[in-house]
């Protein structure tokens, strides 16, 4: 109070203004340099995911998959992980923020990998769900294709003026119509930047230069089956650019990437 009184004495007419909303608004739009750094982080992440897909096999411990991811990031040029990696096999794939990463992978299960490399203050945030044995079962493929359809529809709708809430509704409608609405237990995504869950809320219209994640999922604990697919998306003047499109995502592309 004493300090404020001195400020008022020396600067008549000054007032305290709430600027808490200014910084988030500024951070929600990235410069071209910032987007390049995020793209670099995504590219380094692609190396880690490629190594992990080759490494995943029955009997491998989740933490060894994490180690493979992080080794790939470092060898590609990354500076560690943007956040603690999630590597959840079987029932653990249905745990949204699973963090133990200490169980052996089991043949016939899926493993959900949610991770991203860190570079120059910025990080990637990617999720892929892959079959431990290298091939999706009929049921796994059925659920996976629904999540993929929802993700692709939401990505295609990204453009300036759209909100994350509207993108959520697009993906959620597809998953709900397929009979899995109650198993999509989180929102569609978030802003990405200096923090993994960067500032700016889900109802603010997206602007050119924003970078967001799109990450629908279906989690069936009674089947020990969880699927999440996540990409990092730049909002462009006329639509979007998928910064992580190089990371295998279709059933056939994942199975090919895992072939020994």
Question: What spans do the regions from the language model cover?
Answer:
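Active-site neighborhoods and metal-handling regions in enzymes and metal-associated proteins
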Residues: 1-260
């Amino acid at each position: 109070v004493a300090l404020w009184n001195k400020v008022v004495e020396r600067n008549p007419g000054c007032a305290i203004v709430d600027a808490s909303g200014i910084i988030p608004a500024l951070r929600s739009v990235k410069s071209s340099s910032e987007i390049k750094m995020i793209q670099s982080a995504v590219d380094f992440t692609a190396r880690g995911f490629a190594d992990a897909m080759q490494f995943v096999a029955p009997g491998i411990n989740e933490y060894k998959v994490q180690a493979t991811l992080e080794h790939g990031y470092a060898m590609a040029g990354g500076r560690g992980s943007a956040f603690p990696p999630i590597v959840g096999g079987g029932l653990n794939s249905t745990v949204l923020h699973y963090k133990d990463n200490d169980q052996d992978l089991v043949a016939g299960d899926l493993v959900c990998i949610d991770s991203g490399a860190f570079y120059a203050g910025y990080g990637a945030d990617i999720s892929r769900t892959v079959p431990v044995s290298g091939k999706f079962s009929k049921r796994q493929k059925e659920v996976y294709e629904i999540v993929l359809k929802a993700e692709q529809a939401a990505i295609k709708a990204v453009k300036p003026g759209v909100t994350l809430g509207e993108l959520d509704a697009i993906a959620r409608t597809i998953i709900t119509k397929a009979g899995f609405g109650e198993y999509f237990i989180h929102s569609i995504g978030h802003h990405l930047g200096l923090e993994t869950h960067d500032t700016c809320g889900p109802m603010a219209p997206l602007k050119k230069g924003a970078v967001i994640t799109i990450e629908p999922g279906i989690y069936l604990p009674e089947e020990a089956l969880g699927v999440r697919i996540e990409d990092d998306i730049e909002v462009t003047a006329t639509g979007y650019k998928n910064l992580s499109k190089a990371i295998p995502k279709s059933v056939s592309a994942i199975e090919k990437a895992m072939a020994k």
